[in-house]
């Protein structure tokens, strides 16, 4: 894998800077404190794509079953970053991140390990992450179960900044097939795992306002994570019970077209920062603290 040009990401909103200082103090005496790092580096190429502004609609995917399965096609190559506002309205984010020296096992372990303590979650994005407890933590930690049995059907309750907005979200992890991904195509694509989910506002967990797809696959030298986020209203979301209420709920919470486009941009930046940062330390963290997740 050829070397990438990584650059420091240095702008964070004032609430995020204040959160960083609180997180830094909280993690200080933890055995993993050295992995709490000030500098966050991201691929310059990903930054430049986001700087080009919203994507053309013909280059985006919708959350329809047909479109999400394009991610599994042999000749489909995801762009490194990008965002757009889809008709609906719906925020759209796409990304593809490389994790040098990382394996699928390491990535699975991270999703088992980090919810146990808020301080662990802050390692992932020190300026944005507050807490991410798991509803069924005992099941998540049950080593007699496979990774999929521990994660799917489980809910993480994330509190995090996206831009300067503090969001409280329920992330309901699902079997890929439950979200519409074709089982045969998934197998043929040799995907090593999925941490895909429906997302809702914490105050209204019965209304999914977002579909989030994360597919990871080992390659020579590391692992790729291909991601898509859709937040808002779209006819194809009707396959998920409660999603028909998403448009009115988001509007009630101040998410009109302009706010959703801003959210798409901020989510694109957030995704770029958090996953590239995780990639920078996960292999070392796993070697020190890791145990098999499946």
From Swiss-Prot:
The keyword Membrane does not apply. It catalyses: 2,4-diacetylphloroglucinol + H2O = 2-acetylphloroglucinol + acetate. Keywords: Hydrolase, Metal-binding, Zinc. Optimum pH is about 6.0. The keyword Zinc applies. Zn(2+) binds at residues 129, 160, 270, 274. Specifically and significantly activated by CoCl(2). Competitively inhibited by MAPG, but not by 2-hydroxy- and 4-hydroxyacetophenone. Its EC number is 3.7.1.24. It comes from the Bacteria. GO terms for molecular function: hydrolase activity; metal ion binding. Its cofactor is Zn(2+). Hydrolase that specifically degrades the potent antimicrobial compound 2,4-diacetylphloroglucinol (DAPG) to equimolar amounts of mildly toxic monoacetylphloroglucinol (MAPG) and acetate. Belongs to the DAPG/phloretin hydrolase family. Homodimer. This is 2,4-diacetylphloroglucinol hydrolase. It comes from Pseudomonas sp.
């Amino acid at each position: 894998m050829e070397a990438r040009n990584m650059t420091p990401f240095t702008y964070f909103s004032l609430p995020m800077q204040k959160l960083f200082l609180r997180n830094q103090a909280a993690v200080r005496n933890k055995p993993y404190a050295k992995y709490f790092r000030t500098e966050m580096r991201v691929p310059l190429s990903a930054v430049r794509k986001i700087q080009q502004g919203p994507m053309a609609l013909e280059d985006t995917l919708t959350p329809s079953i047909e479109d999400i399965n394009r991610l599994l096609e042999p000749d489909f190559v995801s762009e490194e970053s990008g965002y757009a506002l889809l008709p609906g309205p719906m925020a759209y984010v796409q990304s593809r991140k490389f994790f040098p020296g990382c394996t699928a096992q390491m990535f699975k372990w991270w999703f088992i390990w980090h919810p146990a303590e808020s301080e662990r979650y802050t390692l992932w994005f020190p300026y944005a992450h507050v807490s991410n407890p798991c509803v069924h933590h005992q099941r998540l930690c049950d080593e007699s179960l496979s990774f999929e049995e521990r994660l799917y059907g489980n809910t993480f309750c994330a509190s995090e900044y996206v831009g300067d907005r503090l969001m409280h979200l329920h992330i309901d992890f699902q079997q890929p097939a439950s979200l519409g991904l074709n089982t045969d195509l998934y197998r043929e694509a040799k995907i090593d795992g999925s941490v895909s989910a429906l997302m809702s506002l914490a105050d209204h967990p019965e209304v999914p306002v977002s579909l989030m797809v994360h597919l990871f696959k080992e390659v020579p030298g590391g692992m790729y994570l291909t991601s898509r986020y859709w937040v808002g209203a779209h006819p194809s979301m009707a396959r998920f019970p409660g999603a028909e209420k998403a448009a009115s709920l988001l509007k009630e919470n101040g998410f009109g077209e302009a706010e959703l486009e801003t959210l798409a941009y901020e989510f694109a930046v957030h995704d770029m920062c958090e996953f590239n940062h995780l990639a920078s330390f996960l292999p070392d963290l796993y070697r020190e603290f890791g145990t098999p997740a499946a």
